[in-house]
Amino acid sequence: MARCSNSMALLFSFGLLWLCSGVLGTDTEERLVEHLLDPSRYNKLIRPATNGSELVTVQLMVSLAQLISVHEREQIMTTNVWLTQEWEDYRLTWKPEDFDNMKKVRLPSKHIWLPDVVLYNNADGMYEVSFYSNAVVSYDGSIFWLPPAIYKSACKIEVKHFPFDQQNCTMKFRSWTYDRTEIDLVLKSDVASLDDFTPSGEWDIIALPGRRNENPDDSTYVDITYDFIIRRKPLFYTINLIIPCVLITSLAILVFYLPSDCGEKMTLCISVLLALTVFLLLISKIVPPTSLDVPLVGKYLMFTMVLVTFSIVTSVCVLNVHHRSPTTHTMAPWVKVVFLEKLPTLLFLQQPRHRCARQRLRLRRRQREREGAGTLFFREGPAADPCTCFVNPASMQGLAGAFQAEPAAAGLGRSMGPCSCGLREAVDGVRFIADHMRSEDDDQSVREDWKYVAMVIDRLFLWIFVFVCVFGTIGMFLQPLFQNYTATTFLHSDHSAPSSK
């Protein structure tokens, strides 16, 4: 029983001792805060300097937590950053032995003096941080303040290589009311911290260098600038924009492979042109309305639109050639040589067999006509008789001798006069039909030649269009691969324009 009472007394003593120590610790921190923020010795409106000429050195460092978005059209970058600020305040010092060896204390940031460091190139009017967190104060007067903030900063968007582009968006920090003679801003680190960074699905972080800028013409000017060098991830725009454009352009190639007789050449050309116009309107809603550069996708769309317009013009010319006839156009000899003999071989076109056979027959007939074979049916002249044009002359001579020998037969010969006129008319009709068929055959051959010329022109422009599209597409989209984007390049371009107040 005595042991139990002793144990209870021991536990009670330990509990009372722990409670007293906690109360004493709380009392110590409370006494320290009251000591530091005593209105009689501390005024948060006064700069922590012993005299007017003393500089207050403020160390800055940006920690990027998240790259929220980059709005290309409005040219605004939204980021979630932690702005580290460190300085010394001689009024917030104490001796640790007077306060139970307490070396650090956290004070509300709105109750102490703060350097009014703001984002100078903000785009929404929110210059200050969004949350005033507590400041960590050490016994030697050094203050560590890490407020989080969501900044919207102005960013000049370079659209030349969109969507394979890299951007340099800057964040410029400086004191709003204090100049260099009162506050000296220095970099705590040459690069921004990425220890707590959440990766973005649209951008890759290339480099985050920081620099301290001074103006030679103004000795009171100083700022801290961080360069956010970021590269776009092009997969989204490649799948949703570039590949559809390439496929639509490939449809324009089929215009030259489409037969002219189907009547859908112009319809296909106009449809492709309208589709490209829709994509061009989509691009205009994404990129900023600038006249300094044309985005890469916009250049490609304009390139394809020019090609499609060219295909429309060539299709009109091909259709015009396709529907020509001997009554409207005469085929020049050089057209026959170039488009019927030379180009088909170069373009790997094989002439149809029936066309070759018809051409051989036509050449053979013309050769016979030149040799006098046109007298196959009958000869014109005073001794020619239509009734005897298809009769063997030897038999005619024998028949004539028989008629002369017998007087009765002479009367029969005279009675055949009306028959002679009918036969002449029949022969004239046969000759007219033969001439008409020959003319129709010649006209049909000429029309077939014009159609073949149109097909050769179609095939010629097909190969030209294929080569121009392939090499033009490769040449345009290989440009971003040869661009040499480095942090030094961006920084050199920024240093070329000196900062000023």
Curated annotation (Swiss-Prot):
Segments on the Extracellular face: 26-238, 289-300
Which keywords does UniProt give here? Cell membrane, Disulfide bond, Glycoprotein, Ion channel, Ion transport, Ligand-gated ion channel, Membrane, Receptor, Signal, Synapse, Transmembrane, Transmembrane helix, Transport
Q: How is its activity regulated?
A: Activated by a myriad of ligands such as acetylcholine, cytisine, nicotine, choline and epibatidine. Channel potentiation by calcium is stoichiometry-selective, CHRNA4:CHRNB2 nACh receptor is achieved by calcium association with topographically distinct sites framed by anionic residues within the CHRNA4 subunit and between the CHRNA4 and CHRNB2 subunits. Oligomeric amyloid-beta protein 42 activates specifially CHRNA7:CHRNB2 nAchRs. nAChR activity is inhibited by the antagonist alpha-conotoxins BuIA, PnIA, PnIC, GID and MII, small disulfide-constrained peptides from cone snails.
GO aspect biological process, one term: membrane depolarization
Principal localization?
Answer: membrane
Does the entry annotate any disulfide bonds, and if so which pairs? Answer: C155-C169
| Stretches in topological domain Cytoplasmic | 260-267, 322-459
Signal peptide range equals 1-25
User: Sorted alphabetically, which Pfam families does this protein's record hold?
Assistant: Neur_chan_LBD, Neur_chan_memb
Q: Where found in the cell?
A: Synaptic cell membrane; Cell membrane
Q: Which SUPFAM superfamilies match?
A: Neurotransmitter-gated ion-channel transmembrane pore (SSF90112), Nicotinic receptor ligand binding domain-like (SSF63712)
Transmembrane portions of the chain: 239-259, 268-288, 301-321, 460-480
> Which residues does the annotation flag as glycosylated?
N51, N168
Q: Where is this site: Key residue for a rapid dissociation (K(off)) from the conotoxin BuIA?
A: V136, F144
Question: Which membrane topology describes this protein?
Answer: Multi-pass membrane protein
Gene3D superfamilies recorded: Neurotransmitter-gated ion-channel ligand-binding domain (2.70.170.10), Neurotransmitter-gated ion-channel transmembrane domain (1.20.58.390)
Annotated catalysed reactions: K(+)(in) = K(+)(out); Na(+)(in) = Na(+)(out); Ca(2+)(in) = Ca(2+)(out)
Q: Which GO terms describe its cellular component?
A: acetylcholine-gated channel complex; cholinergic synapse; dopaminergic synapse; external side of plasma membrane; plasma membrane; postsynaptic specialization membrane; presynaptic membrane
Per the UniProt record, the site (Key residue that may interfere with effective access of the conotoxin BuIA to the channel binding site) maps to: T84
Stated family: Belongs to the ligand-gated ion channel (TC 1.A.9) family. Acetylcholine receptor (TC 1.A.9.1) subfamily. Beta-2/CHRNB2 sub-subfamily.
Stored PANTHER family: NEUROTRANSMITTER GATED ION CHANNEL
Q: Which NCBIfam families match?
A: LIC
Q: Please explain the role this protein plays, according to its UniProt record.
A: Component of neuronal acetylcholine receptors (nAChRs) that function as pentameric, ligand-gated cation channels with high calcium permeability among other activities. nAChRs are excitatory neurotrasnmitter receptors formed by a collection of nAChR subunits known to mediate synaptic transmission in the nervous system and the neuromuscular junction. Each nAchR subunit confers differential attributes to channel properties, including activation, deactivation and desensitization kinetics, pH sensitivity, cation permeability, and binding to allosteric modulators.
Q: What is this protein called?
A: Neuronal acetylcholine receptor subunit beta-2
